[in-house]
Amino acid sequence: MKNVTFPANENVLKSLQLAIQSYSNYLSSYIDALNKYISHQRRVSTLRFERATLIKYVKKLRFFNEELMSMDMVQQYRGGNLIKTAVCSLASFFIRCLEVMDLLNYYLTQSLKNETISKTLNRDLVVSEDCVVFLESTYRHYVKFTQWMLEALDIHDATLTVEVLQFARKCAKEDGLDLEETDDILLQEVGVVSSASEYQELLDEWCLVLSEQYMGLTKAFEAETTRWSEIFEGRK
């Protein structure tokens, strides 16, 4: 086992701050898109309950986002703290966000979709399959990043796990999958770093990957909101 007890130097803390910004961008993309969808839902009286549920989700995402924006990793953890201490605290909050995002994605792609189609008889008022692909891909990348944050420092804690990751591993084990050959990002193994500089370098690379995911998701949401606007306006 490698010695991964590194001090939290300022460079690493600044990179963790970039990770916080990446999560904030992720949440903001949902907040912006859902606010527009909620506004359109006002035109359909039969969707009052669904609209109220989405408003509840948006409020939760806003709360998380405000908490993220108030975090200052350099100020909080410089001066003798270990990287593990900062990462465990941050990952714990990220996991809270991910659990809500998992429920929200399910609501958008299953419950809300089914209720909207049932009440309006219109399949165009829901999240499109093209957008769902981006929802799932982006979520899985943020899950994997959070797992990497921890396991790259050889942190294995039952309280710092994401349900979807545990489920994927359980299914893979039951199916006898070779994890070294899988293309599933959730099942790919994480290597332990040997230095703080290596951790920072990989952390920065991950932030670039998350940025690409966020931009793809944002474009998908923009296409959806444009489509929703045209459809809902046509129902006036």
Curated annotation (Swiss-Prot):
Extract one GO molecular function annotation from the record: RNA binding
Task: One GO cellular component term, please give it.
Answer: nucleus
The biological process GO terms on file are: mRNA transport
Q: What SUPFAM superfamilies does this protein's entry cite?
A: RNA-binding protein She2p
Function statement = RNA-binding protein that binds specific mRNAs including the ASH1 mRNA, coding for a repressor of the HO endonuclease. Part of the mRNA localization machinery that restricts accumulation of certain proteins to the bud and in the daughter cell.
Quaternary context: Homodimer and homotetramer.
Q: What is this protein called?
A: SWI5-dependent HO expression protein 2
Q: Which organism is it from?
A: Lachancea thermotolerans (strain ATCC 56472 / CBS 6340 / NRRL Y-8284)
List the lineage, top down.
Answer: Eukaryota, Fungi, Dikarya, Ascomycota, Saccharomycotina
